[in-house]
């Protein structure tokens, strides 16, 4: 917006003015969604039978004064290894985690393990057109803790399905805090929640294990990954974990060489209760976190992580709210609501009973006499 104003009008808007405008514009964000939940302001659409909840964390570069205490201390104690840039793997310690959440409904899309493997192949077989997420709402917050955002996600889901007639699922990446919060919220709301581990995270572990067995660039690694992925999709994750460990032992790999294999096996065993992909595929559930990954990219990475950016807490929260409204398709409705609230604050609040008097009608003006004279 600032760039558009500058290019079209030749006016430069100061940064602080933009931040203040964003804070004022986003001040009714929570009230807007609270009203929707309490009054069911927006009619719940007839949507697919699967109701998905998903959340993730994404770091935002902050001013040092706005970092959490532990992160600020780590930033102050950090000793840079290089003078002008960070070395590989070195962290800046300047980020504060935001929590990103998404709630949507979707139609079932049943698939087979073989179809998934072929779809993930470099030259993949095109599947039938998959259903798109419906009535998707995404949002992010850096001020509120993860438990508050998970609660908001369940409140949004409850608004859409108050009688719990849909199938509730949660797509996760394996973060233990997130898993604990989801289970607790499901218990509080009395809903049966199916938790599904993101398949792409599983695939990343498989590829790391594959390179422990194969030389770099060896095409046999693709077949190795495909075979084990198919078995995991058939619901045999524990057998895959045991098999790759046994293979590493028979090959006599050292502790360092087999570390990626053990990490993959540990991952599969730790989360095996969320790896029943055979059931998920048969019921047509989504098995990847593409929606929340896209939300993290749009809401946080594309705007908040631009080169040199350092955010204040209030400024970051304001921009996250506005981008969330735009991404969810709620901005126009929110803006009408925000203008109503501004009218109440700036006008109705100043008069008794909120009755703003009508302006006095303008006095009628007499028609001016013509200055032209008839000359005979």
Regions found by a protein language model. Give the residues of each.
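Catalytic center-proximal scaffold of phosphoryl-transfer enzymes
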Residues: 1-376
């Amino acid at each position: 917006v600032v760039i558009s104003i500058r290019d079209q009008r030749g006016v430069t808007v100061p940064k602080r003015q933009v931040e203040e405008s964003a804070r004022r514009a986003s001040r009714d964000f929570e009230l807007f969604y609270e009203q929707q939940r309490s009054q069911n302001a927006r009619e719940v659409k007839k949507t697919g039978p699967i109701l998905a909840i998903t959340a993730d964390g994404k770091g935002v570069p902050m001013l040092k004064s706005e970092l959490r205490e532990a992160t600020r201390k780590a930033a102050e104690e950090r000793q840079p290894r290089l003078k002008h840039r960070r070395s590989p793997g070195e962290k800046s310690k300047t980020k504060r985690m935001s929590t990103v959440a998404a709630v949507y409904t979707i139609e079932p899309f049943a698939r087979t393990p073989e179809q998934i493997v072929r779809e993930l192949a470099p030259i993949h077989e095109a599947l039938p057109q998959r259903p798109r997420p419906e009535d998707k709402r995404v949002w992010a917050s850096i001020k509120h803790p993860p438990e508050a955002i998970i609660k908001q996600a369940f409140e949004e889901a409850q608004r859409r399905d108050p009688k719990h007639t849909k199938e509730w699922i949660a797509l996760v990446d394996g973060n233990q805090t997130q898993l604990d919060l989801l289970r607790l919220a499901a218990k509080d709301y009395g809903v049966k929640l199916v938790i599904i581990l993101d398949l792409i995270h599983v695939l990343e572990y498989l590829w790391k294990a594959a390179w422990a067995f194969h030389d770099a660039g060896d095409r046999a690694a693709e077949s190795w990954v495909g075979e084990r992925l198919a078995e995991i999709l058939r619901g045999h994750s524990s057998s895959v974990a045991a098999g790759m460990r046994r293979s590493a032992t028979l090959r006599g790999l050292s502790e360092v060489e087999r570390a990626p294999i053990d990490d993959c096996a540990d991952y599969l065993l730790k989360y095996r209760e969320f790896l029943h992909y055979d059931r998920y595929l048969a019921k047509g559930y989504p098995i990847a976190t593409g929606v929340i990954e896209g939300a993290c990219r749009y809401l946080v990475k594309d705007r908040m992580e631009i080169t040199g950016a350092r955010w204040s807490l209030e400024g970051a929260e304001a921009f996250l709210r506005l981008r969330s409204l735009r991404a969810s398709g709620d901005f126009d409705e929110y803006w009408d609501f925000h203008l109503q609230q501004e009218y109440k604050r700036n006008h109705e609040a100043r008069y008794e009973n909120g009755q703003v008097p009508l302006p006095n009608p303008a006095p009628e003006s007499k028609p001016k006499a013509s200055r032209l004279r008839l000359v005979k």
